[in-house]
Amino acid sequence: MNRINMSQEIQQLRRLIFDELSKIVDPEIGVSIVELELIDKVDIKDGNVDIDLHLTSPFCPAIFGFKIAQDVRDNVYKIHGLDKVKIKVSNHFMADAITKQVNESKLPEK
C-alpha cells in the first residue's frame, strides 16, 4: 500500500475513532468526553491504537474514571481494522490502577 493510501486509511480510522469517542459521556457531567477535550492523544499504527486521556478532576470517583476508560477501549476496539487498543489514563489519583485494570480486562466481541 502506498503512502497516500495509508495516510487516507489512518485519517478514516481517526474519524471513526472520534465518532465512537463522541458517544461516550462523562457520567458526572453528562457531556461527551470529546466535547470536554479529555482525549490527549490518539496514535494509530499497524492496526494498533494508543489513546491517552485525562479525567475531569484528579479526584473524581474512580468508578467513573474506570467506566470512561473502559468505554473508550471497548468502543474503539469494535472498529473494523483495529487489532489492539491500549489506554493510558492521567491526571487522576488512581490513574495507574485504572490504566492497568482497563488494559487487562476482557475485550468485547467484535
PLM regions with names:
Residues M1-K110:
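Domain-level signature for proteins that mediate thiol-based redox and metal-cofactor handling
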